[in-house]
Amino acid sequence: MGLSDGEWQLVLNAWGKVEADVAGHGQEVLIRLFTGHPETLEKFDKFKHLKTEAEMKASEDLKKHGNTVLTALGGILKKKGHHEAEVKHLAESHANKHKIPVKYLEFISDAIIHVLHAKHPSDFGADAQAAMSKALELFRNDMAAQYKVLGFHG
């Protein structure tokens, strides 16, 4: 399920918009994740106390973590599917330490697409959304495969 060169270009063009404000985009993605799927908040001891969107928006720690998440994802996307080493490292921490189920990766993928479309509607049309969805699915599938190797069935 690889992406064509054209699809990767759409993904990377969209990601260029993220890189103009990684922390801001990351914060919005995490807020979307936590408000849309409150159960995901339970995996984050540092953020469990944040109960409202206003509290989340005011949290510098949440913004920093959003920056960390999207910086890592950006590095993976720029590998255009050749991300084995990055995914292996990420899967190890997410399976063994954080215990993040694959389903939650799907939730955050949806949040990323939603935030990109909301913030950049003219630059993130149907073709770009489809390409990003495909790239994020590739990432999730590779994470799931690594989870299996690690014996994590989350």
Swiss-Prot record:
Catalyzed reactions per annotation: Fe(III)-heme b-[protein] + nitric oxide + H2O = Fe(II)-heme b-[protein] + nitrite + 2 H(+); H2O2 + AH2 = A + 2 H2O
Phosphoserine modified-residue sites: S4
Family annotation (InterPro entries): Globin, Globin-like_sf, Myoglobin
Positions with a binding annotation for O2: H65
An example Gene Ontology molecular-function term: oxygen binding
GO cellular component annotations of the record: sarcoplasm
Positions of nitrite binding: H65
PROSITE patterns, per database record: GLOBIN
A biological process term (GO) from this entry: removal of superoxide radicals
Record-annotated Globin domain positions: 2-148
Signal peptide: none
Enzyme nomenclature, EC number: 1.7.-.-, 1.11.1.-
Keywords linked to the UniProt accession: Cytoplasm, Heme, Iron, Metal-binding, Muscle protein, Oxidoreductase, Oxygen transport, Phosphoprotein, Transport
Keyword Lipoprotein among UniProt keywords: no
Binding site for heme b: H94
Location within or outside the cell: Cytoplasm, Sarcoplasm
Quaternary structure (record): Monomeric.
Biological role: Monomeric heme protein which primary function is to store oxygen and facilitate its diffusion within muscle tissues. Reversibly binds oxygen through a pentacoordinated heme iron and enables its timely and efficient release as needed during periods of heightened demand. Depending on the oxidative conditions of tissues and cells, and in addition to its ability to bind oxygen, it also has a nitrite reductase activity whereby it regulates the production of bioactive nitric oxide.
Cited PANTHER family: MYOGLOBIN
UniProt similarity note: Belongs to the globin family.
Protein name: Myoglobin
Species whose genome carries this gene: Bos taurus (Bovine)
Gene name, Swiss-Prot/TrEMBL: MB
